[in-house]
């Protein structure tokens, strides 16, 4: 297994050490700021690379939303035949060139990188430190001394007796869980079209994910090194910001965010929505700043 993941260890460690090399002259080679920013830099690079997958995820989610009426019709028609229902669903997905698993692509793509980073940081936390990838023995010794708000980045909640480590870990886990919850809720409240929640498979899955993912982070986070928690907290924050931008600037048709955008455009244009005139200028109003010509008076004949 280790030999298979060696290229990933090399890639992850090379990115971290390259960013570290740029920041070390400013903050110091053993500084927690240097190593923390190196991990954050890794997140930014990965998320930029994953933008095409994110675009595909958005398109797939919108396609699935548009197919909801047809999916409900298939479920009603073949409610007593699960196999036929699955076959018809797959036929529908194929016909419209969409994939219900596309929304998982960004997470799946990050999983190997996440595991590689976990292994690299876990090796740093061992006594003596174990190097992976392109890290030298001097690098792992420096990294082992690096601290994030007083807590070594290689320490874990369960593996340390330090109160500082436990406090920092709990704060990071809480931040991870909160950003995951708010990101998912933002999508459900603002980014999805209004639809009947009864027998709606997609909406039910979204509701499950809303509460399940934060719980998973809370349970598993106690085993992660602080450096990994920094990575995951940063990627969650990026996801929230990226989704906020998409919902604000390019919302899904039929969603509350889309309606808000249409009303905003209508107010600017002074058009009518749902029978109500929105800021429509009066035609007889004079344009501000335009000079009016004086009316000429007719002279009386003598």
Each model region followed by its residue ranges:
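Interfacial loop/helix-cap signal at membrane boundaries in integral membrane proteins
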Residues: 1-37, 133-164
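Membrane-interface starts of transmembrane alpha-helices
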Residues: 30-42, 168, 202-206
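Alpha-helical transmembrane segments and their helix-entry boundary regions
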Residues: 39-40, 103, 227-229
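Hydrophobic alpha-helical transmembrane segments and adjacent short intramembrane/lumenal linkers
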Residues: 115-260
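Cytosolic, positively charged, low-complexity intrinsically disordered regions immediately flanking transmembrane
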Residues: 239-302
């Amino acid at each position: 297994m280790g030999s298979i993941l060696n290229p990933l260890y090399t890639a992850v460690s090379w990115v971290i050490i390259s960013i570290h090399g740029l920041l070390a002259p400013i903050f110091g080679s053993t500084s927690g700021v240097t190593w923390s920013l190196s991990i954050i830099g890794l997140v930014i690079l990965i998320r930029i690379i994953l933008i095409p997958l994110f675009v595909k995820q958005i398109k797939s989610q919108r396609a699935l939303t548009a197919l909801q009426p047809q999916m409900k019709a298939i479920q009603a028609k073949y409610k007593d035949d699960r196999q036929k229902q699955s076959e018809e669903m797959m036929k529908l997905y194929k016909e419209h060139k969409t994939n219900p698993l596309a929304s998982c692509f960004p997470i799946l793509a990050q999983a190997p990188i996440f595991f590689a980073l976990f292994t690299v940081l876990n090796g740093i936390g061992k006594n003596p430190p174990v190097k992976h990838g392109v890290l030298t023995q001097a690098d792992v010794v420096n990294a082992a001394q690096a601290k994030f708000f007083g807590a070594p980045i290689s320490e874990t909640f369960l593996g340390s007796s330090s109160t500082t480590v436990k406090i920092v870990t709990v704060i990071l886990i809480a931040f991870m869980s909160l950003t995951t919850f708010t990101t998912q809720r933002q999508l459900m409240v603002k980014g999805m079209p209004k639809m009947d929640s009864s027998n709606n498979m997609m909406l039910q899955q979204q509701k499950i994910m809303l509460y399940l993912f934060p719980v998973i982070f809370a349970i598993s986070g106690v085993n992660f090194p602080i450096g990994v928690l920094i990575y995951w907290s940063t990627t969650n924050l990026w996801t929230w910001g990226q989704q906020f931008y998409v919902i604000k600037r390019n919302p899904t048709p039929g969603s509350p965010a889309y309606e808000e955008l249409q009303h905003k455009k209508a107010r600017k244009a002074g058009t009518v929505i749902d029978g109500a005139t929105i800021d429509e200028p009066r035609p007889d109003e004079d344009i501000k700043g335009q000079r009016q010509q004086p009316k000429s008076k007719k002279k009386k004949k003598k």
